[in-house]
Amino acid sequence: MVKIISDSTCDLSAELVAQYDIDILPLHILLGDEEFEDGKTITPDEIYSWSDEHKTTPKTSAPSLAETIELFRPYVEEGCEIVCFSISNSMSTSGNVMRLAAGELEAENRITVIDSANLSTGIGLLVVEAAIMAKNGHSASEIASVMETLKPNVRASFVVDTLTYLYRGGRCNAVAAMAGGVLKLHPKIVVENGAMDATKKYRGKINSVIMSYVKDMETDLKAARPDRVFITHSGCDAATVESVRSFLESLGVFHEILEPRAGGVVSSHCGPGTLGVLFIAK
């Protein structure tokens, strides 16, 4: 048996986690002196309230070694193989903690740690594929091999409503944040080679910006793997999300269109009103 585990930044819904029998290892979110578990003891809306009140971005940290060992140990004792996914190594030490836990359990030969080189449902796309393979009886080595092949084909991007949260987190300077607010600029953030990079900038109200962003990807979307696409957002209004879904449905490409809410870690850095369309290219 192969067990699939991911850290909480995969942003998969509780329904998907249950459907595919995936275990989630929460990262930590620190609001001042208080520490919370991503997806378990705090919500994104609570994070926004705290961040706006204190004019700063919460700190996030990897799971502890003890927590990781506690999650892994029962599966190791049962003789399972484990394939676990972490947020990009350039963004967190989550993957390193997983490797340390494998060493502490003397199970390096049965625990495979995959650096997703991604975030949010860019990880989730890989995790779901791995879980399907595990259910179909594939070995950990077979799953890991396919994941390494798929990683460069994951297309993860999003547009943000406000640059305030990126500025608070040190991901853009004060001048850019102020100009973005005055000019109503909304950057497209793309994940490439495990890092985030701002590419095209859109101007206008966020609802129209989101639709422009999605329609600009039409050619790539039509060439995507048809299994599934994620509309991942951090609290966009329902009408906007529905408009994105309608556009994706009109393409006639995807068998499954999923709408997860971004988790606490991603929401901490991007703020409310962020939306991304994530898929795997053929």
Annotated model-derived regions:
Residues K3, T9-D23, H28, E34, ...:
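Mixed-charge interfacial surface used for oligomerization/domain docking
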Residues E35-E106:
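Class I S-adenosyl-L-methionine
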